[in-house]
């Protein structure tokens, strides 16, 4: 059992270093099972899973940030946030400097020629690991058929890797389970704050704000909208 979210030298808490290592090992094992020579993910939660990198909500729509994981290699992160690339490298020492600004792409790509910089960058990384052909898994690729065509022209075969990552994430280690328990406890605390504040005349938006405030105070990166409904708004769908 882990004790809270704060690390201490006298209490066993969530071991994030162990969790990062476990997640990377799970991904590599599933890549091996599925015969993948590389996996590229644009999925924010799989970027988090493989590289422990956070894709802010405001930058997700364009799907320009991604991670490349070659067979037998390490994660390579292409990202942009409020941090500079240099600051991101300092913020995430476990990536050992393998952090770069994301090239233009994602949902903005509609033709193969627009992937030229992306392909040059990714194929260069794969070549460093001796991968110049083989099977590449694309996870949550924003323009799948365009990128598939680009990789085929470069001598690779392509598959959808969504199921590979689903299977990798489906078995949690003790640290991930501790995170799930803590998230549930935070949700309980948020609803308790709402319950304490309910009284005649209070606005629904005020109750929603109290719930979100509680979650952020307890360390949430982001929150889903609370559905606070009363009166005629409570009719079931």
Regions found by a protein language model. Name each.
Residues 1-186:
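A composition/biophysics-driven feature that prefers long, compositionally simple stretches
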Residues 30-50, 132, 143, 185-237:
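Active-site cores enriched in adjacent His and Asp/Glu residues with nearby glycine-rich loops
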């Amino acid at each position: 059992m882990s004790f809270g979210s704060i690390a201490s030298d006298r209490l066993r808490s969530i071991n994030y270093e162990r969790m990062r290592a476990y997640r990377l090992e799970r991904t590599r094992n599933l890549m091996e099972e599925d015969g993948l020579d590389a996996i590229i993910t644009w999925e924010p939660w799989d970027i988090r899973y493989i590289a422990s990198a956070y894709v802010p909500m405001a930058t997700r729509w364009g799907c320009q940030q991604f991670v490349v994981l070659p067979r037998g290699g390490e994660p390579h992160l292409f990202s942009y946030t409020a941090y500079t690339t240099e600051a991101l490298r300092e913020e995430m020492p476990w990536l050992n400097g393998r952090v770069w600004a994301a090239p233009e792409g994602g949902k903005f790509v509609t033709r193969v020629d627009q992937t030229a910089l992306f392909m040059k960058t990714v194929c260069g990384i794969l070549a460093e690991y001796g991968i110049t052909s083989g099977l590449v898994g694309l996870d949550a690729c924003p323009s799948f058929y365009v990128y598939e065509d680009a990789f085929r022209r470069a001598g690779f075969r392509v598959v959808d890797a969504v199921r590979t990552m689903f299977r990798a994430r489906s078995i949690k280690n003790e640290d991930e389970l501790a995170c799930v328990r803590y998230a549930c406890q935070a949700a309980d605390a948020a609803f308790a704050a709402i319950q304490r504040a309910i009284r005649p005349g209070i606005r629904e938006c005020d109750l929603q704000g109290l719930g979100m405030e509680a979650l952020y105070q307890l360390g949430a990166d982001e929150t889903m909208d609370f559905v606070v409904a009363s009166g005629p708004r409570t009719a079931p769908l």
